[in-house]
């Protein structure tokens, strides 16, 4: 039965049957640990690799000794406000040695500002919060593969993949000859390479491979006889057209594979090589085999303490690989599965940064070498030699434009957390979504406990982007490890000792599931238990079990573990549920779920949106904006709260204290709630009284019927903040000016502007209202004598300016909540040419309305179709009206029964007045739900009689009623709905632009034209194809006719017709347009057309309608596809997909 358990500030009744042996790790340690490693060791490695730099004569030597990171100039909040990067200066100690004179110069050199990670695991780049996503790539090492030839013969291939350097591949053909490819060139007999390694004669080669028959066969194809010939043969293949010499050939082979500067296996590559080939070559021992020794886990023997990994290839590696291939041909050994997580590793922030830094340093190294030769040896200093530009540029480029550096998804705390735990197989050095096949995307047995099998985007990225499982961690080689409890095989007892295993270590062990029954001393209750080994699921005797799962939720990611009754949902729907929780909008009055999974507290705490006590103590002051704690050491810690700031996605970030003055707080306790958290628990939505029934077709096809009470009482009201900015620049005609004095604008429009011309905080604004008054100098015209006189008398004031004020865009409105002003005079850093910068923040309170998308946690999504008065909603026998009505037909075909169980348990828990936790795959059973319903004195089947709110009659059948957790998603109708009368036109075709962002028109496409043709609606059709689209003159005349109330004139020639003629003329065809009487009709250019028409009509055309030739429009028209952020940006999908709720029905 359930037992009470304190999570955060709240008690939940936990229905879990298994006790937790291991607490969840910190959920963003992936990011933090990796960056910490980079600062401590990663940077040092790069400097060590590149140091010393020698000039071509070997006389000057430049060494990098040590480095320090200074203090950042601004705090995180200031960086966001000022649009600067949160970074610290990197200073490196450099020594320059002149061998001839023996002179040594040491200097500290500034190497640029290095972006720092915030405590939340993010980076602030130019004021925007960004996340570096971890990348899943193939691990360096040696891989063996096989394929069946059309003749039915099994062929083998092996590839040696370095971290950087040339690939080496062996392959066999139908006649059992073995070939080698060096760096993707044409293949040559493998014995040529063996010969070039120093085994000159056939006899030596046969002896090396114990007279193997396949080697004998291959030798018949080999037309070299000595080591020198073999080297020359390889050189001819690699450098065709260059005169081969033995020396150049030998040095080429050495630089390709045996030079650590050119060939790098990295630690992980060397480890994988030794693991596969078991040839014992792992370390280089600087002083031979002497010196103090220690036990090494990788080699399982005593080795000297003073050792380092061998980074480059050795001859032994190549020969051992060749031997393994020969064994495979004999039928011994196993081929590798490249989708196994033992062969894929993670490159996290630290390593990605290290690689980028290495690129920058190697570019710098070239510059240093050049400067060493050019400059005078006596006056040279390290400072003069080093040019930091390439280093700074490569870091900037990585953070600013790498595919893996992404704008943080900040819709809600879960979205932030998931983004930091995301694993992407895309990006530089990874896969591309066009080339990725089905195998790479599929769930693999090695994902168990490492990568979530559920959470992945729908669409082209499915399976290429995943999420780290809750308990998984990443080891020093970049492999994911899952925790297991060790089983004492002697006593058949499960201990509490935790062992972390990588995917390939786990492969041969028998591992029991977390739900295997144990007694209180940790002994297995039953004789045989369910267990897995590799990809097999077995029923094994308990004495064979070696490990046991830590927890059922170790398989899933955080978002998936937040779904109660996950075990009763179909996987496809669970995927949607996990993904939609990330799109939940933080509500004004959010509630933690009545039916939770017990992980809500940890998710909220680790996401970084709450304020957590760093040290224990007593709360001495609580206000809306800060909390002060007097620590046990007597110091006072002050925590500043964020109030109504804008997130990356325009949702509202607001923190409010949940402790009182005089409270005792412990370290790690939550002091203040953030957005979408309540009492320190994640609270993405609301608990709402639901009935599963149809209602007059208003919830047909997943639509949702909701009570007006939800609108009145702000159940699903959220705050959205938009940012608008306006800058005053220097133009050729003089500086722009921010002012209240705007030409041709009345005082009533300026009523909310202050004396500077900037809107006041608290003003309510509507579309078209001025936010910042700004004037720009107009082009000078030839002045008449009188004007020159006036100019001379009154000075500059008579100059012509035009109004370029920042106005509220179409379709936006709200209250001004904040205004920030930056200017050159106050010493703010602004972009070149900008003198003033003003930012206005407009907040909107959005209640739930028809057209908003809502969802539960089980992938049950829908659109609000109707908001019904409370008195018309179906009500229960005691008069309580339900608050939301969902369609019961949405449940059976989709097989997400979890929502029904949640509804039952939610009703019982709400009635009894407590909250429950039902952890995934360890939750409440049907029996315990019935038991809880009985305790709450509710019907055991969770159904009750409902009465029609309009007639008071009971409905025919009893209806399932209960409490369900619903969330409002970031697909709001206010952001999608759009209409246009006149607006911008495309430059080439003169047709209206498309989309809400461009204030475009509705596309009347091919099929819509057919529809009108089918009805013979000729005039409607003509109007749509001419004046409403691209008949430039016609639309001006029509506009005028409508304004003056006259009849609309005949349409003219559409611009697209003129474009067609121009295209035909460009093919060299002489195209003329003839009237019925065979007279040629002259087709004018647009400008002539418009200006003539405008003259005839005597109207002054507004700027944009004359002909839009702004650069932005051209760019928008030729929509450039930009894949800089390759993560699942569901909120950027086109409106047409937004409401396709279900494809299957």
UniProtKB/Swiss-Prot annotation:
Disordered as annotated region, ranges: 1101-1145
CDD domains in alphabetical order: RNA_pol_B_RPB2 (cd00653)
GO molecular function: DNA binding; DNA-directed RNA polymerase activity; ribonucleoside binding
Comp. bias (Basic and acidic residues): 1101-1112
PROSITE patterns: RNA_POL_BETA
Alphabetized Pfam families for the sequence: RNA_pol_Rpb2_1, RNA_pol_Rpb2_2, RNA_pol_Rpb2_3, RNA_pol_Rpb2_45, RNA_pol_Rpb2_6, RNA_pol_Rpb2_7
Disulfide bonds: none
Top-level lineage group: Bacteria
Compositionally skewed regions (Acidic residues) per UniProt: 1113-1145
Catalytic activity: RNA(n) + a ribonucleoside 5'-triphosphate = RNA(n+1) + diphosphate
GO terms (BP aspect): DNA-templated transcription
UniProt entry keywords in alphabetical sequence: DNA-directed RNA polymerase, Nucleotidyltransferase, Transcription, Transferase
Ribosomal protein is among the record's keywords: no
Function: DNA-dependent RNA polymerase catalyzes the transcription of DNA into RNA using the four ribonucleoside triphosphates as substrates.
Subunit structure: The RNAP catalytic core consists of 2 alpha, 1 beta, 1 beta' and 1 omega subunit. When a sigma factor is associated with the core the holoenzyme is formed, which can initiate transcription.
Family stated for the protein in its record: Belongs to the RNA polymerase beta chain family.
Name listed for the protein in its UniProt record: DNA-directed RNA polymerase subunit beta
Organism this protein belongs to: Desulforamulus reducens (strain ATCC BAA-1160 / DSM 100696 / MI-1) (Desulfotomaculum reducens)
Gene designation per UniProt: rpoB
């Amino acid at each position: 039965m359930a037992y009470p358990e304190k999570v955060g500030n709240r008690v939940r009744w936990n229905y879990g049957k298994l006790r937790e042996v291991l607490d969840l790790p910190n959920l963003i340690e992936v990011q933090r640990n990796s960056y910490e490693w980079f600062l401590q060791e990663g940077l040092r490695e790069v400097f060590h690799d590149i140091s010393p730099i020698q000039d071509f004569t070997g006389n000057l030597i430049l060494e990098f000794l040590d480095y320090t990171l200074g203090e950042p100039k601004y705090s995180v909040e200031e960086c966001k406000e000022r649009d600067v990067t949160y970074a610290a200066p990197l200073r490196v100690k450099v020594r320059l040695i002149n061998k001839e004179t023996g002179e040594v110069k040491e200097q500290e050199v500034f190497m640029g500002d290095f972006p720092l990670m915030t405590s939340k695991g993010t980076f602030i780049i130019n004021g925007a919060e960004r996340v570096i996503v971890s990348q899943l790539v193939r691990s360096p090492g040696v891989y063996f593969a096989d394929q069946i030839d059309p003749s039915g013969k099994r062929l083998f291939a092996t590839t040696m993949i370095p971290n950087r350097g040339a690939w080496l591949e062996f392959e066999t053909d139908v006649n059992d000859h073995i070939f080698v490819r060096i760096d993707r060139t044409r293949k040559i007999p493998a014995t040529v390479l063996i010969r070039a390694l120093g085994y000159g004669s056939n006899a030596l080669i046969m002896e090396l491979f114990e007279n193997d028959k396949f080697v004998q066969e291959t030798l018949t194809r080999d037309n070299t006889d000595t080591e020198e010939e073999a080297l020359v043969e390889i050189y001819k293949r690699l450098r065709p057209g260059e005169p081969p010499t033995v020396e150049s050939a030998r040095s080429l082979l050495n630089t390709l594979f045996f030079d650590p500067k050119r060939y790098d296996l990295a630690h992980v590559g060397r480890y994988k090589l030794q693991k596969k080939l078991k040839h014992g070559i792992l370390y280089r021992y600087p002083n031979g085999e002497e010196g103090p020794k220690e036990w090494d886990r990788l080699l399982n023997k005593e080795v000297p303490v003073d050792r380092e990994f061998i980074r480059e290839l050795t001859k032994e590696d190549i020969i051992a690989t060749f031997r393994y291939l020969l064994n495979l041909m004999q039928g011994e050994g196993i081929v590798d599965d490249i989708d196994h997580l033992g062969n894929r590793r993670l490159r996290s922030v630290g390593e990605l940064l290290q690689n980028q830094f290495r690129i920058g340093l190697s570019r710098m190294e070239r510059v240093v070498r050049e400067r060493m030769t050019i400059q005078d040896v006596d006056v040279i200093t390290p400072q003069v030699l080093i040019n930091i530009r390439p280093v700074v540029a490569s870091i900037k480029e990585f953070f600013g434009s790498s595919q893996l550096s992404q704008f943080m998804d900040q819709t809600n705390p879960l979205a932030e957390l998931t983004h930091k735990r995301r694993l992407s197989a895309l990006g530089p050095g990874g896969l591309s979504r066009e080339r990725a096949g089905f195998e790479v995307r599929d769930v693999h047995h090695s994902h168990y406990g490492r990568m979530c099998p559920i959470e992945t985007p729908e669409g082209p990225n499915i399976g290429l982007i995943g999420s780290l499982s809750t308990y998984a961690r990443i080891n020093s080689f970049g492999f994911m490890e899952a925790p297991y409890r060790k089983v004492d095989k002697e006593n058949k007892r499960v201990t509490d000792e935790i062992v972390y295993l990588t995917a390939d270590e786990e492969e041969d062990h028998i591992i029991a599931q977390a739900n295997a029954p144990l007694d209180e001393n940790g002994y297995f209750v039953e004789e045989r238990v369910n267990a897995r080994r590799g990809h097999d699921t077995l029923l094994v005797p308990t004495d064979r079990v070696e490990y046991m799962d830590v927890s059922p939720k170790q398989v899933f990611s955080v978002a998936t573990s937040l779904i109660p009754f996950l075990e009763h949902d179909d996987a496809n729907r669970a995927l949607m549920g996990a993904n939609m929780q990330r799109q939940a909008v933080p509500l004004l009055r959010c509630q933690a779920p009545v039916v939770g999974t017990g992980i809500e507290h940890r998710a909220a705490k680790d996401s970084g949106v709450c304020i957590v006590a760093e040290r224990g103590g007593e709360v001495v002051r609580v206000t809306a904006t800060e909390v002060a704690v007097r620590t046990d050491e007597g110091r006072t810690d002050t925590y500043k709260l964020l109030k109504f700031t804008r997130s990356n996605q325009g949702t509202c970030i607001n923190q409010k204290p949940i402790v009182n003055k005089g409270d005792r707080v412990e370290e790690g306790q939550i002091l203040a709630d953030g957005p979408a958290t309540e009492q320190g628990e994640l609270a993405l939505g609301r608990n709402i009284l639901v009935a599963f029934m149809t209602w007059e077709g208003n919830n047909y096809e997943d639509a949702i019927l909701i009570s007006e009470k939800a609108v009145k009482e702000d159940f699903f009201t959220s705050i959205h903040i938009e940012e608008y900015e306006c800058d005053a620049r220097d133009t050729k005609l003089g500086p722009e000016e921010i002012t209240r004095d705007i030409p041709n604008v009345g005082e009533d429009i300026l009523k909310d502007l202050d004396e500077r011309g900037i809107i006041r905080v608290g003003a309510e604004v509507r579309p078209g209202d001025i936010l910042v008054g700004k004037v720009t100098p107009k082009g000078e015209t030839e002045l008449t004598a009188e004007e020159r006189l006036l100019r001379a008398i009154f000075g500059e004031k008579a100059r012509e300016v035009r109004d370029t004020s920042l106005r509220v865009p179409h379709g936006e409105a709200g209250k001004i909540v904040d205004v920030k002003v930056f200017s050159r005079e106050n010493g703010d850093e602004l972009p070149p040419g900008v003198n003033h910068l003003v930012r206005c923040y407009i907040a909107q309170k959005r209640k739930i309305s028809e057209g908003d998308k809502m969802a539960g946690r089980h992938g049950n999504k829908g659109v609000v179709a109707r908001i019904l008065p409370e008195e018309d909603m179906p009500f229960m026998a005691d008069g309580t009206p339900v608050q939301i009505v969902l369609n019961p037909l949405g449940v059976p075909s989709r097989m997400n029964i979890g929502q029904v169980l949640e509804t039952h348990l939610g009703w019982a828990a709400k009635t009894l007045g407590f909250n429950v936790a039902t952890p995934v795959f360890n939750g409440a059973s049907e029996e315990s739900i019935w038991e809880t319903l009985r305790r709450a004195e509710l019907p055991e089947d969770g159904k009750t009689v409902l009465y029609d709110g309009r007639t008071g009659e009971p409905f025919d059948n009893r209806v399932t009623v209960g409490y369900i957790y619903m969330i409002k998603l970031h697909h709001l109708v206010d952001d999608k709905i759009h209409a246009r009368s006149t607006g911008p036109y495309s430059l080439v075709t003169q047709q209206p632009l498309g989309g809400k962002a461009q204030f475009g028109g509705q596309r009347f496409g091919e099929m819509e034209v057919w529809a009108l043709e089918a009805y013979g609606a000729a005039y409607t059709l003509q109007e749509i194809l001419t004046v409403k689209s691209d008949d430039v003159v016609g639309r001006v005349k029509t506009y005028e006719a409508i304004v003056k109330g006259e009849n609309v004139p005949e349409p003219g020639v559409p611009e697209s017709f003129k474009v067609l003629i121009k295209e035909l003329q460009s093919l060299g065809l002489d195209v003329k347009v003839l009237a019925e009487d065979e007279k040629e009709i002259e087709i004018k250019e647009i400008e002539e057309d418009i200006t003539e028409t405008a003259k005839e009509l005597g109207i002054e055309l507004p700027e944009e309608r004359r002909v839009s030739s702004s650069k932005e429009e051209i760019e928008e028209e030729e929509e450039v596809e930009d894949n800089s952020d390759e993560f699942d940006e569901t909120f950027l999908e086109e409106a047409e997909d937004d409401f396709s709720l279900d494809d299957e029905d």
